[in-house]
Amino acid sequence: MGRRNRRNRQRHQRSTEQRSPAEEEQRRKAREQAAWECGYPEIIKENKLFEHYYQELKIVPDGEWDKFMASLREPLPATIRITGYKSHAKEILHCLKEKYFKELQDIEVDGQKIEAPQPLSWYPEELAWHTNLSRKIIRKSPELEKFHQFLVNETESGNISRQEAVSMIPPVLLKVQPHHKILDMCAAPGSKTAQIIEMLHADMNVPFPEGFVIANDVDNKRCYLLVHQAKRLNSPCIMVVNHDASSIPRLLVENNGSREVLYYDRILCDVPCSGDGTLRKNIDVWKKWTTLNSLQLHGLQIRIATRGVEQLAEGGRMVYSTCSLNPVEDEAVIASLLDKSEGSLELADVASEIPGLKWMPGITQWKVMTKEGHWYEKWEDIPTSRHTQIRPTMFPPKDEEKLKSMNLNRCMRILPHHQNTGGFFVAVLIKKAPMPWNKRQPKLQRRPPVSACDASIAVAPELVKAVTENSAGMADEPAVDTENGETKPCTNQSDSSKTDIVCCPPPSKKMKLFGFKEDPFVFVSEDDPIFDPIQTFYALDPSFPKKNLLTRTQEGKKRQLYMVSKELRNVLLHNSEKMKVINTGIKVLCRNNDGEQYGCAYRLAQEGIYTLYPFINARIVTVSIEDIKVLLTQENPFLSKFSKETQKQANNFDMGSIVLKYEPDPQEPETLQCPIVLCGWRGKTSIRSFVPKNERLHYLRMMGVEVFKEKAEVLEKKPVEGKACDEEHIDEKMDIDGAKEESKELSGNESGDDEDPKEEDVIDRGVLEHVALKNTSAIPASVEDQAEDASVSKESVD
């Protein structure tokens, strides 16, 4: 067999060498054509069972069925949302309106004139827009290449999110305030989580809101998509965890020296669903849809929602949502919750909270259909053989008075043809009292105060002894005396570990129960010797919360320092055995060996500069708008290229990390009217910025700099043989370095012995020297990455 294969390869090689380049090209085209003709068949957008089912349930108003089905067969329009809490939101909105949207009006794609994008009437402050273009058209059409580049870069820098319109509804109905403690139970890939973070940071002048978001997902791999989404917003108030939402552990926090159960003010319960509301973008659903999907998910949806209301604080609000139109997944779940809550829950009337949104009220009567098409109107009609498949909670309550008191008409069902969206269901629940099975709330457990030094280590779950969790999620609660409701103190701890379990050093062997490999989250003690040089070098304010800094290594040099809010620190310290934490904290300082000789081994990180800047009182250089352009378009500009005032300020500082601050001038409204804070490095004769490529492009756009270059020009630009094009090499190296850095942070694998590379290696290599200023034709435009859209918008599909 081996000799035969070798002979075949040799014959193929000889025949290839004998063919001319023209013949080779002809054969290649023939192969491509054959592959195209043998491709996947086009999916027919029809499903008779689907139509029969929903026509029978009458969820669509009379006379609208044809419009409903026609809209389902049309591609879903693209929708974008501007990050509202960032100071640059107004500038981005202005840029979109005055530049990109106006240019779109004069373009035709495949003979179809593009309609001007319109704001979503129900989303506040015109921060969400939709167009009649699908995402596929935007991605593939050469005429829209410039607009696509803008979306990709701004999405990566966290200033824009591409998210389905109906997916934006649940966070709006949560009514998040900066002091709220929020749980997102099924968060990945994270577009709704990002929206919640925006609301949490409504006041940009407050670097640490009192509230926080714990974002959970059962899929470990999807958790990293969630981390990627959250990292774009650079918040110290987000924690990503990996648990089954139906048994997510109940957490403890310290309050005035006592330990108490953490109850959330807001919970988003966007459960896994059959997804038949997503037919417009997930066309596979057309051929795969059956009622069996809903019947199988119903029990899981009830368990997740039940666990959610258990952890909701009294007076708190939980939003339940699905991207399914099926009442078995929608009204049936809500009715089941209301029934067993015995008055502890009530459906909120939120019609006035989201004006401009068209929706249909929830239904009060429905039937259940099997995948074979058999209908059942009540549980008593179900054959015994189907009792494991069809449950009593899938039917509406039989008691008319009870059914009326539930107010199921307050549920909201969004139909695709009403506002050119996907299908969606949402309901808002208010918790008025403890759940009947949780009437006896545990009392506070007193314990001695813990010093900052002692309580300095919060390790990841694989480094501590496993705590067995009950499958229903109740075994993780504090031990409660059933007679008096008091929590039982832990008695199996040694005297040296009674103060707090997270004070104990981790065991030598890692726990293998959960199968993930996250590095520990180690809080740095306030008397750590690394703080004095940092405090002196940057003249940090005395109010700087040193105890909120953590690192991801137990031993060796601390390579990167991350910061979390005080409230998240509290959660981490008291729940390290219960939580499978994937990621938390924002990077604020990075180790740089060359910095030691200049007085501080840590440089500032651009990712966390807006969090750290309010505490910095030294090494700040105020720059002009022209200085910012120089910093972002040149790799390592000499001091002589900056304004005289900037040169004067820079000469007052020794070499090392600095802050570059631009303050807008209200007297010049035509210039950029939002502040910019950049991390930089003061060299011997130069200043360079530590800004990722996408952020550079963002700032340049806001300043009116053209950063677009067509793909064709990039592809036609071939390097000289044996020598790569300098510009392409720089972009490629920057992308590789950035990918390595992000991969390390997402995986949490950080070696304490590794140190930052030298200054010239850690700085982003996106030189952008070829960027052209607006109305300046002498300078060629910058080469921008043409990568496909890497962002993942969760449009409520699991």
Curated annotation (Swiss-Prot):
- Biased-composition ranges for Basic and acidic residues? 14-30, 723-747, 763-772
Name-wise, this protein is RNA cytosine-C(5)-methyltransferase NSUN2
Q: Name one GO molecular function term.
A: tRNA (cytidine-5-)-methyltransferase activity
Provide the residue positions that the database annotates as binding S-adenosyl-L-methionine: C186, A187, A188, P189, G190, S191, K192, D217, D244, D270
User: InterPro entries attached here?
Assistant: MeTrfase_RsmB-F_NOP2_cat (IPR049560), MeTrfase_RsmB-F_NOP2_dom (IPR001678), RCMT (IPR023267), RCMT_NCL1 (IPR023270), SAM-dependent_MTases_sf (IPR029063)
Q: Which family does it belong to?
A: Belongs to the class I-like SAM-binding methyltransferase superfamily. RsmB/NOP family. TRM4 subfamily.
Function as written in the Swiss-Prot or TrEMBL entry: RNA cytosine C(5)-methyltransferase that methylates cytosine to 5-methylcytosine (m5C) in various RNAs, such as tRNAs, mRNAs and some long non-coding RNAs (lncRNAs). Involved in various processes, such as epidermal stem cell differentiation, testis differentiation and maternal to zygotic transition during early development: acts by increasing protein synthesis; cytosine C(5)-methylation promoting tRNA stability and preventing mRNA decay.
Quickly give the catalysed reaction.
Answer: cytidine(48) in tRNA + S-adenosyl-L-methionine = 5-methylcytidine(48) in tRNA + S-adenosyl-L-homocysteine + H(+); cytidine(49) in tRNA + S-adenosyl-L-methionine = 5-methylcytidine(49) in tRNA + S-adenosyl-L-homocysteine + H(+); cytidine(50) in tRNA + S-adenosyl-L-methionine = 5-methylcytidine(50) in tRNA + S-adenosyl-L-homocysteine + H(+); cytidine(34) in tRNA precursor + S-adenosyl-L-methionine = 5-methylcytidine(34) in tRNA precursor + S-adenosyl-L-homocysteine + H(+)
